[in-house]
Amino acid sequence: MHKILLVEDDPVIRQQVGKMLSEWGFEVVMVEDFMEVLTLFVQSEPHLVLMDIGLPLFNGYHWCQEIRKISKVPIMFLSSRDQAMDIVMAINMGADDFV
């Protein structure tokens, strides 16, 4: 079973996306403590990271860079932001895709 690390600060969106992914057959690890993103990444060994940009403490770009230092796992930003600059920043920070 493929594992997805879901990094989303909005609890409603996190639960909805997590439920949908689980129903599609994925194992989902949901981050709720945003100081633990890197720790949960290492512990869970996901096949994909779905991440929001606007997170408390450190934004998604920061965590993308930190994950890129240790792994080539695909990182996809899942965000309501749709400005070209947000997409360019995500790709420049090491993301593989932006939805």
Predicted regions and their residues:
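N-terminal/domain-start alpha-helical segments
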Residues: M1-V99
